[in-house]
Amino acid sequence: MFEINPVNNRIQDLTERSDVLRGYLCYDAKKERLEEVNAELEQPDVWNEPERAQALGKERSSLEAVVDTLDQMKQGLEDVSGLLELAVEADDEETFNEAVAELDALEEKLAQLEFRRMFSGEYDSADCYLDIQAGSGGTEAQDWASMLERMYLRWAESRGFKTEIIEESEGEVAGIKSVTIKISGDYAYGWLRTETGVHRLVRKSPFDSGGRRHTSFSSAFVYPEVDDDIDIEINPADLRIDVYRASGAGGQHVNRTESAVRITHIPTGIVTQCQNDRSQHKNKDQAMKQMKAKLYELEMQKKNAEKQAMEDNKSDIGWGSQIRSYVLDDSRIKDLRTGVETRNTQAVLDGSLDQFIEASLKAGL
């Protein structure tokens, strides 16, 4: 005879958790908005404005992730209760096991939705930019920056996010001096925002003929893409705009016109640049979009002392603002904020970052 009380208790628990999420995630409002978005997307002229149509499509996906999951939870829990009744009446262990398996799947789905509660920031659902900057230390630090770039690109790929290299500065011997990556996908900024900080590498350097141990630093800075309708005033007199020739690996010119654009916001010292298009006009638009996003992030940080302190330390790539230590000799990677640690260093460098990211989000960092 199978034990039914623990299963009924689980159903009750999942029902209560689901009801809490319905309130917290504004289920009714989202369901109503989903109907509105679907109606707009069914209009024959919706693609006359491609950018708006794409934005509506993205919004629909985000709304469906909440509405459909909660609908499936409600129906699924009713179905499991029905299966349990059948199992008890027929004394059928196979039906009972089927009900338990369905309950396990529902619990996993609910846990994923509960995790999204941590993405409550205004721009958590937005696409984002990731800046990686090599610290002092020459080739070793530049190679480390390149390893971080690969790690984040692999991580983004594993989550189905789209990535685009906006600007990249090659290292003199190996690696990169800096790179800006645009990462697009559902809650891209929410997922990555706690990765801002300094990453420390300790290893026997392949660039040292003596095979000595070296410590290198590189920084990551994550900021959301800001909607064009956000009111951020930028005084043109505060900007210095430089154009230059875009160059690729090995110094080869991508083209012979000065299409690359660098914009400096003089009061803050913030710099953005773009060279990924042959059109100077498009590169300037992209660099301005990044500038707007960075200035928005700066304003948000001024309202938050902890984030502001991190921004103040951003230029000082050293011991003070470290978030994670990668000690390859000892096969150990440790997050200095949450204490999460792993010895599978290669998996992490290949993009397996979720254990660190999830722990930092759950800790409210």
UniProtKB/Swiss-Prot annotation:
PROSITE patterns linked to this entry: RF_PROK_I (PS00745)
Main location: cytoplasm
Location of N5-methylglutamine modifications: Q252
General function of this protein: Peptide chain release factor 2 directs the termination of translation in response to the peptide chain termination codons UGA and UAA.
Modifications made to the protein after synthesis: Methylated by PrmC. Methylation increases the termination efficiency of RF2.
Organism, as annotated: Escherichia coli O9:H4 (strain HS)
Name of the molecule in the record: Peptide chain release factor 2
Cellular compartments annotated: Cytoplasm
A Pfam family the protein falls into: PCRF
NCBIfam families in alphabetical order: prfB
Recorded GO MF terms: translation release factor activity, codon specific
Top-level taxon of the source organism: Bacteria
Annotated family: Belongs to the prokaryotic/mitochondrial release factor family.
Coiled-coil intervals, chain numbering: none
